[in-house]
Swiss-Prot record:
Quaternary data: Part of the RNA polymerase complex.
Keyword Nucleotidyltransferase: yes
Alphabetized InterPro entries for the sequence: Arch_Rpo5/euc_Rpb5, RNA_pol_subH/Rpb5_C, RPB5-like_sf
Subcellular location: Cytoplasm
Function: DNA-dependent RNA polymerase (RNAP) catalyzes the transcription of DNA into RNA using the four ribonucleoside triphosphates as substrates.
EC identifiers of the protein: 2.7.7.6
Record has Cell cycle as a keyword: no
Name the UniProt record assigns to this protein: DNA-directed RNA polymerase subunit Rpo5
GO CC annotation: cytoplasm; DNA-directed RNA polymerase complex
Any one GO biological process: transcription by RNA polymerase II
Gene that encodes it: rpo5
Organism: Methanococcus maripaludis (strain C7 / ATCC BAA-1331)
Length: 78
């Protein structure tokens, strides 16, 4: 089963690497300040993201409209 096919799961997409500096500049942050998402997360696996990738997550809300947020994919440490 594809996790992304569930109605409650927001859209996840990988941001092209060349756009990451623009995102960081826009929000005046460093890459490591982004919230993290493990590389073992089912949606990370589904979109084939790798550690170092940034995911753009877009959620629809009946009250807030469209909400976009970003997560940095990190490797799982043992």
């Amino acid at each position: 089963m594809k996790v992304s096919s569930h109605a409650m799961v927001p859209t996840h997409e990988i941001i092209p690497r060349e756009e990451i500096p623009l995102l960081l500049e826009k929000y005046n942050i460093k890459l490591q300040q982004l919230p993290k998402l493990l590389d073992t997360d089912p949606l990370v696996l589904e979109v084939e993201a790798a550690p170092g990738d940034v995911l753009k997550i877009t959620r629809m809300s009946p009250t807030a409209g469209e909400s976009t947020y970003y997560r940095l994919v990190i490797a799982t440490s043992l």
